[in-house]
């Protein structure tokens, strides 16, 4: 019966394997690497279409798409925070695509299509939090942070890690979120103080949860689901919370690339990723974002968003290429250039 149901679901999305010459779709994936790999493997098993996929942070993927604009090397980009996707749409690097099954998606996902002119879909959502290792902080007699304001306390000097907003879409979400929460001037003053306590800015926002779990960082600022993933993987001293003042969130992006060589195959991979089968891969890969497709029961391991104080994040403004560039340049000049 399960095989029949799976077959029916794939048929509805036009995804059953059919005899063909060697078919290949090229993709950039910016979410959890295990999820990227599992999705590609399962899609190939289901359809017979080979996936050649490169794992890149969203900032890196955007830079590569710009460099390859005259001769695109990939067909599809999926996963990772949506702001860089919106910047790519603005720079005419993407092809518009509005799936026929938007009725199966949550409203926040459909709004991403509407806002972007159908150039960017919302694959999942998740929110920014702070995670810590109780054991690591306990050895140093440090209390766990609960609010953004706590993180600038000098007692946390050398204890906090986050990603670099130039290479990580998640870190850019943090910076843009602080600006919207506090106002730009106050946010930059805050980030200057926070900078003094940062031990390192990593390339990807996926590093913080792992480094906190392994005691390599006492506190990490990233998407909260990552810390929950580590806790469920056996690192029971990992804890996390959403900042008490309010926090930003992401809409994970998915988009077709303008000028793609394998556009029709890319649509098949896209549709499969948005189907219940494809969306369910995330939790199987222990990647616990909230999926966009509402037609199936999401895994109980996925953190609830109940009680989290979310800001009214302006995706259109902060996803704009010029605004993103301005903020990143200002952050480099006024924050990252300071000594720690």
At which residue positions do the language-model features occur?
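Bacterial N-terminal signal peptides that target proteins for export
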Residues: 1-8
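Periplasmic-binding protein-like
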Residues: 190-195, 201-202, 234-258, 294
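Conserved C-terminal helix/tail region of periplasmic/extracytoplasmic solute-binding proteins
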Residues: 313-340
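Extracytoplasmic ligand-binding site segments that recognize negatively charged/polar headgroups
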Residues: 30, 34-37, 73-209, 213-216
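Mature extracytoplasmic/periplasmic domains
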Residues: 252, 257-315
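A ligand-binding cleft/hinge motif common to bilobed small-molecule-binding domains
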Residues: 83-87, 213, 217-237, 286
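Early extracytoplasmic/lumenal segment of secretory-pathway proteins
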Residues: 23-87
